[in-house]
Amino acid sequence: MLDPKILRQNLEHVVEKLRRRGFEMDSDTFLQLENKRKEAQLAIQSFQTKRNQLSKTIGMAKSKGENPELLMAEVSQLNDELKQEEANFETIQKAFSDFQLAIPNLPHDSVPDGKSENDNREIRQWGAPPGFDFTPKDHTVLGERDNQLDFEAAAKLSGARFVVLRGSLARAHRALAQFMLDLHTDQHGYEEVYVPYLVHEECLYGTGQLPKFREEQFQVAGDRNFFLVPTGEVPLVNLARDEIIEAPALPKKWVAQTPCFRSEAGSYGKDVRGMIRQHQFQKVELVQLVQPENSYQALEEITRQAEKVLQLLALPYRVVELCAGDLGFAAAKTYDLEVWLPSQNKYREISSCSNCEDFQARRIQARWRNPKTGKPELLHTLNGSGLAVGRTLVAVMENYQQADGHIRVPDALKSYMGGVDYF
């Protein structure tokens, strides 16, 4: 959520920055709501002033032995009118809040202009795509051996965009997740956290998935108002809801492995085959809570930490900076990591690392105590995939494939795979 003060004091500036990301803010509606809010506030203050004056007059009348009955009736009438005006103010505040919740974050000044992923800017590449003396196979073909990658069984259980992993592929999937967790906890200083996979609606409002992306969420039937987590970012960031963290305890660095559930409502016809785009997938998520002045340094750090996974697995990748029009709803700046997939002869997204500044923190009131002032101030929140486990498995399968269809185990993964060289 944007700072209401910025909206009120620099509306034209906000409108222009939002226009960079392709969002047209209805400034007329904002001004109408703001005027109604001010009018209602003034009316409430006026009623309160009159009531206070009458209360004093009643007190004086009683002290003189006069009958204050008429004055008390007037106070009663004022109280009724005040309640009505307060209810009106609450309605206006709700409309104002709903309006604010629909506004995305402002892009950082360093974010390049652009409308779509075609306008994203490549920052760097790492590693060279492997050369094969045979035509490389798609991961779905590689997974046919011993039926280790079974989409038919998954369809029988759950429908399209699910997978059943068996044998060595299931073990490799587990090994990758464990490898990522060990790296981030042992070398990058993250605290591992186990979180619920069902969260309340307010958590999704807190991180920005709601209200805009409701159709992309899986909501649990019944009266409990539960949603399946679309990413580990949701429960991790919401751990700081309504908290005030002392400065010496910062930064908070949390990592969790969770399943992620997404309806992919806007992805009809995209990546229909395979494990690239699924309703359920595992992801190792990194979250940092930092002092505002440190957040862009933290963004570079979290991106390098996600890159380290790919480097240790010796998977070729590139880093791209998202243009303003391709930014996620809550992000002020984002780097995507894209891994090389030989069967597609191109890079595909495997991680997204974002600085949300105080956008999420304002929604959930996540604060730190500034020792200079002694007062609570909003934190900056960052998140990054470290990495998407299924897509990493796809990248390993395709980049390490052999002519006979077996997969060579990356050196960094061998200890997690029982020391085998191939699977």
Swiss-Prot record:
A single GO molecular function term of this UniProt record: serine-tRNA ligase activity
Highest taxon above the source species: Bacteria
Pathway membership: Aminoacyl-tRNA biosynthesis; selenocysteinyl-tRNA(Sec) biosynthesis; L-seryl-tRNA(Sec) from L-serine and tRNA(Sec): step 1/1
GO CC, alphabetical: cytoplasm
Catalytic class of the enzyme: ligase
Positions with a binding annotation for ATP: R262, S263, E264, E349, I350, S351, S352
UniProt KW Cell membrane keyword: no
Cysteine pairings via disulfide bonds: none
Catalytic activity: tRNA(Ser) + L-serine + ATP = L-seryl-tRNA(Ser) + AMP + diphosphate + H(+); tRNA(Sec) + L-serine + ATP = L-seryl-tRNA(Sec) + AMP + diphosphate + H(+)
Coiled-coil region: none
EC number from the UniProt entry: 6.1.1.11
Main location: cytoplasm
Gene Ontology biological-process annotations: selenocysteine biosynthetic process; seryl-tRNA aminoacylation
Keyword set includes Nucleotide-binding: yes
Entry-linked PROSITE patterns: AA_TRNA_LIGASE_II
UniProt KW keywords: Aminoacyl-tRNA synthetase, ATP-binding, Cytoplasm, Ligase, Nucleotide-binding, Protein biosynthesis
Ligand binding (L-serine): T231, G232, E233, E285, S385
Subcellular location: Cytoplasm
Family stated for the protein in its record: Belongs to the class-II aminoacyl-tRNA synthetase family. Type-1 seryl-tRNA synthetase subfamily.
Domain description: Consists of two distinct domains, a catalytic core and a N-terminal extension that is involved in tRNA binding.
Function: Catalyzes the attachment of serine to tRNA(Ser). Is also able to aminoacylate tRNA(Sec) with serine, to form the misacylated tRNA L-seryl-tRNA(Sec), which will be further converted into selenocysteinyl-tRNA(Sec).
Binding partners and assembly: Homodimer. The tRNA molecule binds across the dimer.
Protein name: Serine--tRNA ligase
Species per Swiss-Prot/TrEMBL record: Coxiella burnetii (strain RSA 493 / Nine Mile phase I)
